């Protein structure tokens, strides 16, 4: 019997995270989350689902094929330089997924299915005027995705952000 954990104060984001936590537990993958309160309130449910399901699908597939089997999802609000929502996903990865030109190489068996997840992520990032960077760390065999959403460019931003994580 699986008990849902409360990892987010947003019910949809909590459900998405719990789906992947359950899948990871079943496959021996360590998944850690640190999701601060009210960090994704500006995003529609459709966009939140598209963004986080695609990010976590990609991370899950890569971690499953790696020898360390790790995923980490962090979402926080920071005011270090300006008001920003920072989404970071880090996962173990068996090999560098970029070709020599910096393009992602698909590991999917069907080439027809390649790229839709990344395009969906890029669509959401662009819609909310964010920036995304992805890189592979050869030394640690980890893939990193960093997404920044800037308060100044997000419609319907709520100012009630907290620096505290939810109790797990």
What are these model-derived regions, one by one?
Residues 126-137:
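Glycine-rich ATP-binding loops of the HATPase_c
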Residues 70-82:
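Short beta-strand/loop element within the Bergerat-fold HATPase_c
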Residues 32, 74, 133-135:
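Short beta-strand patches within cytosolic ATPase/nucleotide-binding catalytic cores
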Residues 95, 137-146:
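Glycine-rich nucleotide-binding loop
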Residues 82-119, 152, 156-167:
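Glycine-rich/acidic phosphate-handling loop/turn and adjacent ATP-lid/helix
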Residues 45-69, 124-127:
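Conserved ATP-binding N-box helix of the HATPase_c
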Residues 5-9, 31-51:
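Conserved short strand/loop->alpha-helix "switch" segment adjacent to the catalytic nucleotide/phosphoryl-transfer site
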Residues 9-27:
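Short beta-to-alpha transition helix within the HATPase_c
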